[in-house]
Swiss-Prot record:
Pathway: Amino-acid degradation; L-alanine degradation via dehydrogenase pathway; NH(3) and pyruvate from L-alanine: step 1/1. Induction: Upon nutrient starvation. Coiled coil: none annotated. This is Alanine dehydrogenase. The keyword NADP does not apply. The lineage of its organism: Bacteria, Bacillati, Actinomycetota, Actinomycetes, Mycobacteriales. L-alanine dehydrogenase activity increases when the M.tuberculosis is shifted from aerobic to anaerobic growth conditions. CDD domains: L-AlaDH. It comes from Mycobacterium tuberculosis (strain ATCC 25618 / H37Rv). GO terms for cellular component: cytosol; extracellular region; peptidoglycan-based cell wall; plasma membrane. Belongs to the AlaDH/PNT family. It catalyses: L-alanine + NAD(+) + H2O = pyruvate + NH4(+) + NADH + H(+). Its EC number is 1.4.1.1.
Length: 371
């Protein structure tokens, strides 16, 4: 099979969908690997590195898209790439379709077979391809939140850990999943007072046990959420419903009652965001004001640390890439139910029930295309 990797096109997206180790394994198995020249530069992987591993360097993205049977990306296609989507090609990448009707329509119109990293799900409910980027985004959320709390950045002028005799920042994390856990862990390590809210008592119990009560936990009722947000210097939204739009848990009217200069970091922005006022931003212009607070809603946070993120992501994706390349998408999905959970579109059919519900598009059972 011909496996293609173009350069990422999203704003300040420095990750790449494969490493030289992945290239070497694919070519060892007899597959061709086509990589757009310069695709790895943002992750400090040179063309020479890829070529030495067995890749063929291609001059343009158009050629990669046109020649590849299996196309690997990190982020969803942007509008400039919609014309490259085509029938008969497998696209394996993050998609986040519930938050993008335009991308969904482009995939359906093209007939592309697409598989979303973020909805590949094992029998125990784990999301093995989303997890490493959630770890990175959660850890970054505490860092960027601390940075934007500085008065010079428009924040309250609060130091996360305080100093002797002066109280630390009050950090609230909404969601105790992978991203929320990692955000809370870093914020706690920085010395902040951290409260995590979730509706999953087992996750709260795990946090309480691991951190011996140093991280406060609350069941996420409307009452507890409102009180915590009003007290917070920094709120980190880390809510996830796999494949679906994130619920809007923090209203603009609640934001209006927050402390002036408080910062809100929305990790859930890829899925539409969990704050009412959220809208996607970029690293060029990462923040905007809502009432007297500062919103940070960069949709590709892990892109800022590509030397970490590229390797963390590809460590997780490569076993699935090898299955797709070795057996084709249909056989791979038949033999691996976790991969089948990631099926999103095929020949104009939408195969994700949650995306179909959120966007009001007819749903097709994946089993019907796997038969």
């Amino acid at each position: 099979m011909r496996v293609g990797i173009p350069t990422e096109t999203k704003n300040n997206e420095f990750r790449v969908a494969i490493t030289p180790a992945g290239v070497a394994e694919l070519t060892r198995r007899g597959h061709e690997v086509l990589i757009q020249a310069g695709a790895g530069e943002g992750s400090a992987i040179t063309d020479a590195d890829f070529k030495a591993a067995g890749a063929q360097l291609v001059g343009t993205a158009d050629q990669v898209w046109a020649d590849a049977d299996l196309l690997l990306k990190v982020k969803e296609p942007i509008a400039a790439e919609y014309g490259r989507l085509r029938h008969g090609q497998i696209l394996f990448t993050f998609l986040h379709l519930a938050a993008s009707r335009a991308c969904t329509d482009a995939l359906l119109d093209s007939g592309t077979t697409s598989i979303a990293y973020e909805t590949v799900q094992t029998a125990d409910g784990a999301l093995p391809l989303l997890a490493p980027m959630s770890e990175v985004a959660g850890r970054l959320a505490a860092q960027v939140g601390a940075y934007h709390l500085m008065r010079t950045q428009g924040g309250r002028g609060v130091l996360m850990g305080g100093v002797p005799g002066v109280e630390p920042a009050d950090v609230v994390v909404i969601g105790a999943g992978t991203a929320g856990y990692n955000a809370a862990r870093i914020a706690n390590g920085m010395g902040a007072t951290v409260t995590v809210l979730d509706i999953n008592i087992d996750k709260l119990r795990q946090l309480d046990a691991e951190f011996c009560g140093r991280i406060h936990t609350r069941y996420s009722s409307a009452y507890e959420l409102e009180g915590a947000v009003k007290r917070a210097d920094l709120v980190i939204g880390a809510v996830l419903v796999p494949g679906a739009k994130a619920p809007k848990l923090v209203s603009n009217s609640l934001v209006a009652h927050m402390k002036p200069g408080a910062v809100l970091v929305d990790i859930a922005i890829d899925q539409g965001g969990c704050f009412e006022g959220s809208r996607p931003t970029t690293y060029d212009h990462p923040t905007f004001a809502v009432h007297d607070t500062l919103f940070y809603c960069v949709a590709n946070m892990p892109a800022s640390v590509p030397k970490t993120s590229t390797y963390a992501l590809t460590n997780a994706t490569m076993p699935y890439v090898l299955e797709l390349a070795d057996h084709g998408w249909r056989a791979a999905c038949r033999s691996n139910p976790a991969l089948a959970k990631g099926l999103s579109t095929h020949e104009g059919a939408l195969l994700s029930e949650r995306v179909a519900t959120d966007l009001g598009v007819p749903f097709t059972e994946p089993a019907s295309v796997l038969a």
